[in-house]
Structures are given as structure tokens and as C-alpha cells.
């Protein structure tokens, strides 16, 4: 009877499970932002200086105080991070009164731009439709 374990002479690629296990243990570098409404959200360290709306209020994630969670049993550290020195970076301008949402186009009952009105469509008599159905 053959042994059910694979032969040690054959080459097999490394298991993907081992790679996933290592990736899961890697610490995610993110910061926690506490909002005035009592909610909190986490943002990745590389995604700083972006804004969003929450409960009708616009928020910027460009605060100077970042709470870094390094994973494991370590307590959070408070650090002041300077913005990355990149000359092509857009300056951090976050105005809570700006509204970047485009208004909806009003719907109308007029004819579509691509189709002519129903008056311009050719009318076919009953004999035409009888020939089509009998075909």
C-alpha cells in the first residue's frame, strides 16, 4: 500500500496559507480621529489630508494630533506629524462651507434630444403589421 503523504523528492510551492498568516500579523498603520458627535473613525497613515461628510457635517482628516495604533498590546502614542514635504502636493485647504456636490439635472417631459417627436415617426397601416406577424 502506498503512503498517503506526499513524497519529499518532489518540489512543491510554498503554501499560500503561510503567507496569509504573516500578512495578518503585520501591523496596520492607521490613525484614529474622534469626531465632535462622539463617533470615531480610522484612517490609513498614507491617506492624510482628505475630507469627508458625516451626518451632514464636513470633516477634514488634517489634524496635527494623530493617535497611532501600532497593534498588539501597545498603548496608543500621541505624536505630531508634519505634512510630507512634497512640492507637488496640493496645500491643505479644507473649507467646511464648500459644497462639491453637483445639482441634479431637472427632468422634463419634452422629447429626448436623440429621438424626434412622436408626430415625426412614420405610421404604418394594419396591412403592414399583418404581413410582419404572418412572416
UniProtKB/Swiss-Prot annotation:
Record has Metal-binding as a keyword: yes
Post-translational modification: Phosphorylated.
Main location: host cell
Region Disordered, residue ranges: 82-102
Keywords, alphabetical: Activator, DNA-binding, Host cytoplasm, Host nucleus, Host-virus interaction, Inhibition of host innate immune response by virus, Metal-binding, Phosphoprotein, Suppressor of RNA silencing, Viral immunoevasion, Zinc, Zinc-finger
Quaternary structure and partners: Monomer. Homodimer. Homooligomer. Self-interaction correlates with nuclear localization and efficient activation of transcription. Monomers suppress local silencing by interacting with and inactivating host adenosine kinase 2 (ADK2) in the cytoplasm. Interacts with and inhibits host SNF1 kinase. Binds to ssDNA.
Role, per record: Strong activator of the late viral genes promoters. Enhances the expression of the capsid protein and nuclear shuttle protein. Acts as a suppressor of RNA-mediated gene silencing, also known as post-transcriptional gene silencing (PTGS), a mechanism of plant viral defense that limits the accumulation of viral RNAs. Suppresses the host RNA silencing by inhibiting adenosine kinase 2 (ADK2), a kinase involved in a general methylation pathway.
Protein name as annotated: Transcriptional activator protein
Species per Swiss-Prot/TrEMBL record: Mungbean yellow mosaic virus (strain Vigna)
